Amino acid sequence: MAFYESVVITRPELTESQVESLINELTSIISTENGKVHSTESWGLRNLAYKINKNKKGHYFLINIDCNPSAIFEYERQMRINEDIIRFLTIKIDHISD
């Protein structure tokens, strides 16, 4: 298994409960693929560097993951489908720092 860091930006119109449920959906995808989510960190509602789909702000999240590449493929596929996610980036890292 490999370590990954994923930053997810959601639409600013989402309520706190909607954002939490969306993050829970994403973490459950990793769990069903026999992966492990080490941490989920909310960076809050922040300004975007430039407009994305007419949005000036977004809810930012950092998720640290330990899983197989096939799990990341499904994880990213689900994020592409979801209209509440306006941008994401997942990178492979050597180790997860605490």
Give the role of each language-model region.
Residues 2-98:
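Structured, basic alpha/beta domains of bacterial-type, RNA-associated proteins
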